[in-house]
Amino acid sequence: LTSSLAIAVIIRPFYNRHAKLAGHITVSTISAAFVLSLWTLCSVIQNGGTTIGWEPISWLQVGNISITVGILLDPLTAIMLVIVTGVSLMVQIYSIGYMQGDKSYARYFSYMSLFTASMVGLVISSNIIQLYLFWELVGLCSYLLIGFWYHRPSAATAAKKAFIVTRLGDFGFLLAILYLVFNADIFAGGDLNSLDISVINTALPNAAKAGLIGTSVVTWISIGIFNWFQSKEPRYASL
């Protein structure tokens, strides 16, 4: 994550001179990230699928709710890290030849590095607020990549369309998150640091059965999260 973010900034000086180096630097970095992802997956498997996490850092305190930033590695996360870095590596290797001669060659690899960093951050997020922030960053990168050749009307139109569609889905996801945040005491005793979907799936029906919330609220939260998943397709098209 850190290396991809750094590369997105470091290759900026190559925009005008030595643009070819941008592709090689980016590919070298993502190759190292892919190897580390494989090592992470092997470590998780050797530990019997034990979840690995780091003590989260408090980022923002809102009333009784603490918004933290952390890293969470479990078997699913380890697998997704391998997939994200592996696919990104193949795309970037192909792009070295495909983008050869393009005047915005270095800018493309800068966007790809930021996109990869955003996806990695999304995968390893330890709480839903962090997840949402990285998801929005993924949306920004998707918009930049889809509209990369912004001077072409078709690319500009496609980027705007993808941006609008994903914003609609994200709005539903945001509403669901806000409801969970302001009712954290009901669902998890104020603890929003779990990304385990089974926790939410169990907490919502139990809260409804206990009469703490209405069943209609559970339905609307589910619709909000579902709309978010539905809006993801245009973003993956850019990868």
What residue ranges belong to the model's regions?
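...captures the hydrophobic TM-helix bundle architecture rather than a specific catalytic motif
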Residues: 1-239
